[in-house]
Swiss-Prot record:
InterPro entries: Rbsml_bL25/Gln-tRNA_synth_N, Ribosomal_bL25/Gln-tRNA_synth, Ribosomal_bL25_b-dom, Ribosomal_bL25_C, Ribosomal_bL25_long, Ribosomal_L25_dom, Ribosomal_uL5_bac-type. The keyword Amino-acid biosynthesis does not apply. Keywords: Ribonucleoprotein, Ribosomal protein, RNA-binding, rRNA-binding. The gene is rplY. GO terms for molecular function: 5S rRNA binding; structural constituent of ribosome. It comes from Afipia carboxidovorans (strain ATCC 49405 / DSM 1227 / KCTC 32145 / OM5) (Oligotropha carboxidovorans). One of its GO terms (cellular component) is cytosolic large ribosomal subunit. Transmembrane segments: none annotated. This is Large ribosomal subunit protein bL25. One of its GO terms (biological process) is translation. This is one of the proteins that binds to the 5S RNA in the ribosome where it forms part of the central protuberance. Residues 10-19 have a biased composition (Low complexity). The lineage of its organism: Bacteria, Pseudomonadati, Pseudomonadota, Alphaproteobacteria, Hyphomicrobiales.
Length: 240
């Protein structure tokens, strides 16, 4: 079940960069609510409260009830911008959610059981191939994250999307067979296997010339013997 949090907002009558900068100087963050075939609503939010929500994690998969002068808007964040140097929020876009809405969300992947994995115990490493999963979900069933259990994975084993049980009302957007997590071997393991194969190939290659050398030697021994056997017979015919 999706988490729903409360945020208080104030109306922002003016738009534009100048008005947005004025809001930030006043300790507020400009934002907009759009969607559900209704006109956009420009608002501003308390900077401190918004920061807490963003940095608490799972911001883009959290539902919010935004209270604007007593009117409630049920929304989900779709995008936000942070200052590249100081990391404070600059702007947020909220999508208004209608009754029974279904939306696409990018949900983070959480891995559990790595310390129990036989492959990890043998020196392997858990490699997260996809850190997020694109899902289509009913708004009341948006998962905060997708959990993947790797406790039984051997080296070179993987977990695919169709191996994971998704919550009710949730289905994948991309192919179900996509790889989520794999256990990769330690760096030296592949080189050792290659070295063993190279040594076996070299031994087989050395055996082949030796066998070839033995064959001409046998042929050379037979040829003089045959010539010696024929020579006296030829000489005897001449004396007659």
């Amino acid at each position: 079940m999706a988490t729903v949090k409360e945020l208080k907002a104030t109306a922002r009558p003016k738009a534009g960069k100048g008005a947005a900068r004025a809001e930030r100087r006043a300790g507020r963050v400009p934002a907009v609510i759009y969607g559900d075939n209704k006109p956009p609503v420009t608002i501003s939010l308390d900077d401190k409260a918004l920061r807490q929500s963003i940095f608490a994690g799972h911001f883009l998969t959290t539902l919010f009830n935004i209270d604007l002068d007593g009117q409630k808007y049920r929304v989900i964040p779709r995008d936000y911008a942070l200052d590249p140097v100081k990391d404070f929020p600059l702007h947020v876009d909220f999508l208004r959610l209608g009754e029974g809405a279904t939306i696409r969300v990018s949900v983070p992947l959480h891995v559990k059981g790595a310390e129990l994995s036989p492959g990890v115990k043998r020196g392997g490493t858990v490699n997260i191939v996809n850190h997020t999963v694109e899902l289509e979900a009913e708004v009341d069933h948006i998962p905060q994250f997708i959990e993947v259990d790797v406790s039984k994975l051997e080296i070179n084993n993987s977990v695919h999307l169709n191996d994971v049980a998704l919550p009710k009302g949730v289905k994948p957007v991309l192919r179900e067979g996509m790889t989520l997590v794999t256990v990769v071997p330690p760096s030296g393991m592949g080189e050792e296997a290659k070295g063993g194969a190279d040594a076996a190939a070299a031994a087989a290659g050395a055996a082949a010339p030796a066998a070839g050398a033995a064959a001409p030697a046998a042929g050379a021994a037979k040829a003089p013997a045959a010539a010696a056997a024929k020579a006296p017979a030829a000489g005897g015919d001449k004396k007659k």
